[in-house]
Amino acid sequence: MFEIHPVKKVSVVIPVYNEQESLPELIRRTTTACESLGKEYEILLIDDGSSDNSAHMLVEASQAENSHIVSILLNRNYGQHSAIMAGFSHVTGDLIITLDADLQNPPEEIPRLVAKADEGYDVVGTVRQNRQDSWFRKTASKMINRLIQRTTGKAMGNYGCMLRAYRRHIVDAMLHCHERSTFIPILANIFARRAIEIPVHHAEREFGESKYSFMRLINLMYDLVTCLTTTPLRMLSLLGSIIAIGGFSIAVLLVILRLTFGPQWAAEGVFMLFAVLFTFIGAQFIGMGLLGEYIGRIYTDVRARPRYFVQQVIRPSSKENE
């Protein structure tokens, strides 16, 4: 039996990218939710290279009287998951909660995640109820969730919601992983012994626009496919075998037709030959592109460059920069 340790301190990690409109409300509501826990807490806000006034607002929030906010400023935009990993490297709590800055997942749900974690779960995920996103975002999210479930075998309902709670040993395990393409909910479930999901409210976005454009969602899907599994390479081998068998069968058929109908038929079959040729060429290019993705990931990981660069850390206990 594993001993269940009660949560003593909660760390809330929030990546921020051009969210100056939502920051005052985010800080107020998150602080109120954490105060209601009756536990020690800290709120880590990571500025992911914002071009608006977000970074300055975070510094002011950390330097305010009786503040519980730790501001981490990255030197440029590295992406949501890299920013969260930067926050993970500075947490001091034994339960870490991730939250988006857009307030679509309300901070008021934090006490429910803490209560569920106190039951002994390593990871507490969430499922968005009455989701208030566009049809495109919902459809893309369903496709990505199904892809993840099929490739990882982990039957979690919603990997896209970042409102999640992780025990400290899960976060420490993730910090020891050095691959460049990191998808935190999946990585956490790899190390979790006990994981659960709970339904949470999902609100409309009040401030700004989503930072996930169509191309960023496509890139995310490529990242998921290439960093989670080698199944596409196996499928590519299977496709190559099918094409080889199909090509040999067509060649035999063409010889038979040539012998049966004579040379006149061969001229009329030119377009068919071109169609078959283009099919094979297309399959080859798809395979080359897929192999290139994997080789590119390997090349990036081998270089072992840092996932992010922290420019400044401002803690509430001191106004001196780290």
From Swiss-Prot:
Protein localization: Cell inner membrane
Alphabetized Pfam families for the sequence: Glycos_transf_2
Residue numbers on the Cytoplasmic membrane side: 1-235, 291-322
Main location: membrane
Periplasmic side: 257-269
Key words of the record: Antibiotic resistance, Cell inner membrane, Cell membrane, Glycosyltransferase, Lipid A biosynthesis, Lipid biosynthesis, Lipid metabolism, Lipopolysaccharide biosynthesis, Membrane, Transferase, Transmembrane, Transmembrane helix
GO molecular function: phosphotransferase activity, for other substituted phosphate groups; undecaprenyl-phosphate 4-deoxy-4-formamido-L-arabinose transferase activity
Protein name: Undecaprenyl-phosphate 4-deoxy-4-formamido-L-arabinose transferase
Organism: Shigella flexneri serotype 5b (strain 8401)
Taxon lineage: Bacteria, Pseudomonadati, Pseudomonadota, Gammaproteobacteria, Enterobacterales
